[in-house]
């Protein structure tokens, strides 16, 4: 285990007296010599051999023979110094219960792919420069990223996990001052497009290209949403706008209603005439109340818009036929279907009144005979009797609404000269309300009854 720790890279501390999280305490002296050999450029083959043979020979499925690798997070919160670091929080969030930064499969399979596919790339990257200089910025948390939401370690692991990353992807990520990111990093950003959008600022090792890629992905999502919902944007047009353009405005409706009322009165038509004429000409019968509410702007906007073209057509029809009085009389006759009010002479009314006193509700045969004798229409006689019965019902409750007089309750001889009761009546009326509680009073002894 001490021999294995010689070839592990140090943290940003670098020296032998540092406290790097990956350094075993028993290998402090050998770490400096291992770093110098890595700088020489020949030790990466030994590291590659170590990664292929010794890391895979570890027990319990973990590399380097440790109980748990110090640089990977644990499910229960234990482990090494880096287990709770903010740079691996993204792996904890994406890994579910195990807390490992895998790509949806098992934890052991991810480690196997990381070792087999990334061994040569990692060795080449460590051979290019100082270990502490290259590994420190890549594994350190990015300034400006909030909480523990860090997608950049996932990009590092996905570079080794996905074969499409290429040989220079990881080295380009770890190189000092590298301006661009490898294709594997773009793939990881594409897989985690939502996480890339949540970042307030691009990580330092991504550069301008990775930041532009995240913006391009977010722009693609917005473009897809705009395609699915046309008209949601500021410059889009919808069907409702076209319908609003065709509909008249409230000012137009108000002006038309005023002009229509003036024209109708000038032509000599009533509101009922207009409603019936619309039914005769266009098949839509409107009541006098509807025409009145239209002129007073009391209808809903939708109904006003529906009625306006019909009234406009009626005005045009009336104007076109204004030269010929026959057409005007025809339209007026069509509108005025209600009969005139019948005026009954005084003698005829007296005969009907005398017959009403004898029989308030005559039969159809009696109505026919009475109409023939008085030279009236049968319908006129029937309506008169109906109106007379209604008048009688209105008059009857008004006369009997008051209380009956006292003479109807008490006989004249029952009242004494002083106003008191001389003798109890044979059939006394029900007691007044004041006498209802009389039975509660007891007669005192010795009192005169």
From Swiss-Prot:
Residues 337-396 bind DNA. It is found in: Nucleus. GO terms for molecular function: DNA binding; DNA-binding transcription factor activity, RNA polymerase II-specific; sequence-specific DNA binding; sequence-specific double-stranded DNA binding. GO terms for cellular component: nucleoplasm; nucleus; transcription regulator complex. One of its GO terms (biological process) is myelination in peripheral nervous system. It holds the Pfam family Pou. The keyword tRNA-binding does not apply. Residues 188-197 have a biased composition (Basic and acidic residues). Residues 1-22, 76-108, 132-152, 184-251, 393-449 are annotated as: Disordered. Residues 245-319 form the POU-specific domain. Its main location: nucleus. InterPro entries: HD, Homeobox_CS, Homeodomain-like_sf, Lambda_DNA-bd_dom_sf, POU, POU_dom, POU_domain_TF, TF_POU_3. Residues 11-20, 93-108 have a biased composition (Gly residues). The keyword Transcription applies. Belongs to the POU transcription factor family. Class-3 subfamily. Transcription factor that binds to the octamer motif (5'-ATTTGCAT-3'). Acts as a transcriptional activator when binding cooperatively with SOX4, SOX11, or SOX12 to gene promoters. Acts as a transcriptional repressor of myelin-specific genes. This is POU domain, class 3, transcription factor 1. It comes from Mus musculus (Mouse).
């Amino acid at each position: 285990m001490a021999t294995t720790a010689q070839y592990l890279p140090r943290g940003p501390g670098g020296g032998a007296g540092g406290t790097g999280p990956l350094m075993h305490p028993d290998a402090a002296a050998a770490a400096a010599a291992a770093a110098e050999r890595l700088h020489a450029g020949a030790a990466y083959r030994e590291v590659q051999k170590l990664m292929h043979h010794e890391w895979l020979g570890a027990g319990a499925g973990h590399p380097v023979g440790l109980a748990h690798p110090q640089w990977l997070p644990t499910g229960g919160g234990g482990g090494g110094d880096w287990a709770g670091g903010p740079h691996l929080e993204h792996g904890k969030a994406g890994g579910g219960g195990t807390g490992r930064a895998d790509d949806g499969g098992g934890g052991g399979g991810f480690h196997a792919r990381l070792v087999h596919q990334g061994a040569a790339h990692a060795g080449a990257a460590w051979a290019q420069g100082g270990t502490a200089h290259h590994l420190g910025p890549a594994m350190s948390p990015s300034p400006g990223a909030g909480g523990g939401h860090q997608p950049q370690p996932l990009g590092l692991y996905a570079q080794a996990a996905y074969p499409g990353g290429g040989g220079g992807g990881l080295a380009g990520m770890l190189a000092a001052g590298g301006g661009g990111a490898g294709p594997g990093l773009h793939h990881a950003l594409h897989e985690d497009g939502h996480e890339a959008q949540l970042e307030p600022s691009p990580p330092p090792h991504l550069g301008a290209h990775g930041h532009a890629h995240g913006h391009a992905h977010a722009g693609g999502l917005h473009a897809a949403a705009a395609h699915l919902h046309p008209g949601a944007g500021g410059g889009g047009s919808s069907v409702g706008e076209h319908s609003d353009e065709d509909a008249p405005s409230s000012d137009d409706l108000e002006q038309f209603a005023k002009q229509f009322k003036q024209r109708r009165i000038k032509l000599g038509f009533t509101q009922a005439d207009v409603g019936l004429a619309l039914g005769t000409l266009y098949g839509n019968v409107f009541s006098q109340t509807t025409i009145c509410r239209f002129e007073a702007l009391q209808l809903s906007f939708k109904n006003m818009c529906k009625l306006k073209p019909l009234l406009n057509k009626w005005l045009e029809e009336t104007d076109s036929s204004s030269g010929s009085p026959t057409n005007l009389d025809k339209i007026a006759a069509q509108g005025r279907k209600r009969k005139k009010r019948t005026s009954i002479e005084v003698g005829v009314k007296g005969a009907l009144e005398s017959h009403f006193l004898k029989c308030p509700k005559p039969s159809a045969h009696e109505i026919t005979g009475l109409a023939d004798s008085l030279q009236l229409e049968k319908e006129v006689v029937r309506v008169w009797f109906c109106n007379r019965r209604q008048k009688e019902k209105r008059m009857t409750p008004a006369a009997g609404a008051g209380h009956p007089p006292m003479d109807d309750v008490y006989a004249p001889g029952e009242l004494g000269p002083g106003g008191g009761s001389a003798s109890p009546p044979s059939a006394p009326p029900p007691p007044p309300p004041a006498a209802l509680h009389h039975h509660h009073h007891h007669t005192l002894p010795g009192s005169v009854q």
